[in-house]
């Protein structure tokens, strides 16, 4: 049968213990079931037959309990209870499981559970947070990279100065038809000139558009038929022929008033253009002039 005082006398009172760590100020215990981590009578898991502690496995907290009834069965000595992830519910589970246990054990279990919960929360925050990865670099490689950067900077400045000088000489016409410089610089200069000419042409087009903005024009209607146009042409021809007839009639009226008096009375006033259009289709009139007294011939 297990006797706690005998075990403590053997292990704790200046005797050998494989879990004990001695220091100048205090002794510590490395046993994984120790509730406080200190080597003393109340916290020793070997010298207490009724004992309880909190352990964490893969982010989950468990309550371990040991009683004197299971001391004869080492394989079933510890009873394990899984605690809830909710902090308040886990504390209630500890109180219910350790209701008849010493107050010291119950208080230390809650304290240990609180510490474990805090460092689990801290681990989750660190995993979600971005961390800088420090890559070691030897001094030799660092000096080499620095020298390469300086050389590249000097070469870039030299290339820019040469390009600028060559472009100035090209503008001044110092080379004529021979260009002994990189073709990229020449292409860049040509592109700049093309951009300048394009901008000038666009400005001229804008000015022309501004000048022609107030101009008015007459545009032909696309819905007019050819038959309508032919009718307008016939009207113009008939109007011109009627004017010719009228002028010739006025010249001859003075000479032929006596002969044509009855005919003139029958005709009356000058016909309207609409009537002329209808008569033009059936009647044609011709006039002849002679040295003798003129005679008008009517042809039907």
UniProtKB/Swiss-Prot annotation:
Gene Ontology cellular-component terms listed: nucleolus
Keyword Coiled coil: no
Region feature Disordered, mapped onto this chain: 191-300
InterPro entries assigned to the protein according to its UniProt record, in alphabetical order: Mak16, Ribosomal_eL28/Mak16
Domain of life from the UniProt record: Eukaryota
GTP-binding found in the keyword field: no
UniProt subcellular location: Nucleus, Nucleolus
Disulfide cysteine pairs (residue numbers): none
Keywords for the protein's UniProt record, in alphabetical order: Nucleus
Main location group: nucleus
Biased segments, Acidic residues type: 201-212, 219-234, 250-259
Compositional bias per record (Basic residues), positions renumbered to this chain: 263-281
Family: Belongs to the MAK16 family.
Protein name, entry field: Protein MAK16 homolog
Organism field: Xenopus tropicalis (Western clawed frog)
Taxonomic placement: Eukaryota, Metazoa, Chordata, Craniata, Vertebrata
Gene (name only): mak16
């Amino acid at each position: 049968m297990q006797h706690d005082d005998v075990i403590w006398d053997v292990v704790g009172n200046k005797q050998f213990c494989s879990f004990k760590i001695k220091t100048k100020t205090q002794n510590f215990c490395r046993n994984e079931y120790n509730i406080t981590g200190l080597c003393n009578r109340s916290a020793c898991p070997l010298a207490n037959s009724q004992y309880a502690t909190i352990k964490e496995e893969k982010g989950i907290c468990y309550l371990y309990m040991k009683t004197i009834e299971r001391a004869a069965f080492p394989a079933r000595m510890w009873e394990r209870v899984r605690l809830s992830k909710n902090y308040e519910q886990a504390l209630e589970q500890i109180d219910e499981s350790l209701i008849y246990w010493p107050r010291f054990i119950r208080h230390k279990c809650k304290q240990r559970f609180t510490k474990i919960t805090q460092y689990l929360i801290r681990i989750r925050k660190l995993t979600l947070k971005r961390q800088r990865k420090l890559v070691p670099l030897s001094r030799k490689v660092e000096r080499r990279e620095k020298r390469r950067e300086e050389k590249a900077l000097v070469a870039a400045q030299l290339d820019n100065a040469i390009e600028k000088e060559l472009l100035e000489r090209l503008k001044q016409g110092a080379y004529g038809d021979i260009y002994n410089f990189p073709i990229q610089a020449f292409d860049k200069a040509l592109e700049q000139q093309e951009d300048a000419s394009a901008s000038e042409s666009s400005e001229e087009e804008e000015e022309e558009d501004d000048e022609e903005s107030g101009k008015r024009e007459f545009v032909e209607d696309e819905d007019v038929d050819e038959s309508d146009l032919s009718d307008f042409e016939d009207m113009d021809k008939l109007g011109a022929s009627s004017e010719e007839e009228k002028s010739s009639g006025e010249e001859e009226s003075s000479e032929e008033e006596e002969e044509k008096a009855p005919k003139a009375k029958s005709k009356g006033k000058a016909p309207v253009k609409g009537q002329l259009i209808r008569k033009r289709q059936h009647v044609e009139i011709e006039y002849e002039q002679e040295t003798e007294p003129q005679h008008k011939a009517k042809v039907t």
